[in-house]
Amino acid sequence: ARSILDAVESQDVVTFTGSAVTGRMLKSHPRIINEAVPFNMEADSLNSCVLGEDAVPGTPEFDIFIKEVRKEMTVKCGQKCTAIRRIIVPEKLIEDVQIAIGQQLDKVTIGDPRLKEVSMGAMVSKDQVQEVKERVVELTKTAKMVHGNLDEVSVIGANSKDGAFLAPVLLRED
């Protein structure tokens, strides 16, 4: 990124999405400062999705909620900064939501994204997989894993041991 930033001028705009640490490092680049380059940063977001009490199973709103949560969990392996990290559900609907999301996650196929039957690819690296596993274990100190498995993943068109694959995991905290 440094070589790209060395070429920016005052009429350019730099937009960054990622960690706050990296964003601050980029924003302090001499060219950004000296040329007064506008710098927009979206960092370390914690997005949520709230289900209303009237969005019960069988309603379009419930179906859209489940579809969006599944999509956010699986697009880019859930690793995009704007992904939903937390869902808030009325207590009376927790079981229904948990079951519906689990059913949708059961349909997710993991593997080589070049194959049309694959709906979720690998993470960036095995180090990232390990970090996610460690964070999930930390979260399970207060939340219960209700879907997924950190140690097993079924992969299509690739070797699960060679790639950075991790199945979607759903946690529940009452």
Language model features by range: what are they?
Residues V8, V13, A20-D174:
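ALDH superfamily catalytic-core signature
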Residues S3-D6:
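Hydrophobic, small-residue-rich alpha-helical packing segments that form membrane-like cores
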